[in-house]
Amino acid sequence: MNQYGYFADEVCEYVITNPQTPVKWINYLGSLDFGGFVDQTGGMLICRQDPALNRITRYLTQDPPSGFRGTTLYLRIPKEEGGYEVFSPFFVPTLTSFDRYECRVGLGYSTFISEMRGLRTEIRVFIPLGEQVLIQQVTVTNLSESAQVVDLVPVVEYTHPDALKQLINADWVPQTMQSYLDAEDAGFKILSQAPFMFKELWRNFFTANLPVSSFESDRQVFLGENGYGSWASPGVLQERELSNSLALRGDNIAALMLHLGEIPEGESRAAIVLLGQAEGVEGAKPSISEFSDPVHVDKAFEALKAFWKAKLSVAQVATPDPDLDRMINIHNPRQCYITMNWSRYLSLYQLGFG
């Protein structure tokens, strides 16, 4: 193993063991119909059909790798003296020291495993075949010798769908961005978002399969101090609950407060977080209902693995050189498939602006 990771050929993965890689490392999810990429610290650029004209998350590839990019998750635990200790199992943006870190780069999925502050967090990120919803399947396990009270806060920052306009029209774009709330029974909530001129055509949606005790949709409020707070330490996360602000303009985000509750020593709690786009909230509900069930999520993940197993099985070689085998059997066909689907249109270098 080198200082950054190793190949796990038996499961067709590359395992990153140090998130501070010399360059950002991305993995493609889904397809051009709905998809994008996730980097080695959980930042994601997601779009539907055209990253120039229907981009969903705000991810600037030129930004320093230590900063927030598009999506993240926070965990928080109460301090004895009051307030909360806040950290991200993705390492970025809190840059919290870790006892273990793995980003397992698979075929159409990434699995993150981190251990810090007495908690082990596993996050599987993928898009089911043929679907327009991104799944983050989260499991938090208490490794400490006493019970811990844990909150989970997933966050996404939206961009204007016209990706170039987001960068060059600072006057008009913020006036168009709006967030909406659809409250369900038993505390379940769907936060949706769209520029007002598109809201009757489609909505981005963000939700979870656990009750949402509070939410935030205004970036300035989330960061705190009139926006002078930071993604590394958002001011609102020192409060018991988020503000329940519905942004009618400005920089739209979606953040959900999920109280995992007290986790006894050695036990786990799980959550499923969903990000997608549909023709209105009603159009999103069938996908939300299906993929809020962990049984259906596991079934969709197995279908994704079966798809890649069938694709790779068409041609396999066995030579005296395991590196050559790895390239021909796994990574070259994967690269060809990704290039065919994305046409070198969206990456860290091809920015997908049209």
State the predicted function of each range.
Residues 1-354:
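Anionic coordination/interaction segments
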